[in-house]
Amino acid sequence: MAKHEMLKNSIIIGAHPDDELLWFASILKDVDEIVLVYEDFFAEPHIGDARRKVIAEFPHPNVTSLGMSESGAAGCADWSDPKIDRYGVKLGIETNRRILTGFARKSYASLVPSAQDRGIPWINRAYQDNFALLQAALRPRLRPDMNVFTHNPWGEYGHEEHVQLFRVLDGLRQEIGFKLWMSNYCTNRALPLAMRYFAKAAGPYVRLPVDKDYAQKLADLYIKHGCWTWPADWRWFDEECFMEAPSDDREPLDFGHLFPLNMFTMSEPKSSLRMTTTVAASAAGVALAAIALTD
């Protein structure tokens, strides 16, 4: 079968190793190139080496890593009322709460010393510095004829580094002229930001089936090396939808449309390393053209 037009000269650019799998499982085998941004994370000293082992064994023939270090910004924005700034999502009081509760994949005992050593200003500065580093690293890789797949503007489940990567690539799209595509994952946490990208009319999109066997094979590779960052009970959706990503957020419309969303819920962990998710695999979860905003 011939490749879909959007998969010609195609590249997935994902923030963290396993993002390429979680949000692009239907196209992962068929894209021409995969680029992953981050390896090391100060709160998880082992994870960089583990990720490098996965990349070395990755079954796709063209996977590279930028080898950047995570900023630690995950969970640092107020997702009940997210504010976009030049670097991504504005970090704020949630930074304090995240450090005190050990919100991003770590227990209190292991995260707090590392975070306290650096401090809240360090996380903000690292997040801001990464914006420029991403621009410099990605600009020479991109051409006008490319189809670039990356995180959606709300960061799927509300991840600050996902939003930042989208905004970097959105700026480079305006500069270089490639097509920028996003997939359709969203959560209760990210919905306030996602709704700012709804439009007056639904746009065109492409729907593709998820290769669940291939996805699980790759998930097992991450699990083998101890760097699978997602819940063990995650269940793949049957399909994914892709559309060209909108640029500007706006105030939510009275009647807004986007495209079918793969909606799932996420609760903040209390004592577990992993985030708890509940996949809404019903028709309401995967086939709404507009969420609770249209009849």
Which residue stretches match the model-derived regions?
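Active-site rim/loop-helix segments in enzyme catalytic domains that contact anionic ligands
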Residues: 1-143
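Structural alpha-beta junctions
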Residues: 31-32, 57-65, 170-182, 202
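Short, solvent-exposed loop/turn segments at secondary-structure boundaries
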Residues: 46-47, 158-163
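The feature marks non-catalytic terminal segments
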Residues: 97-111, 117, 175-295
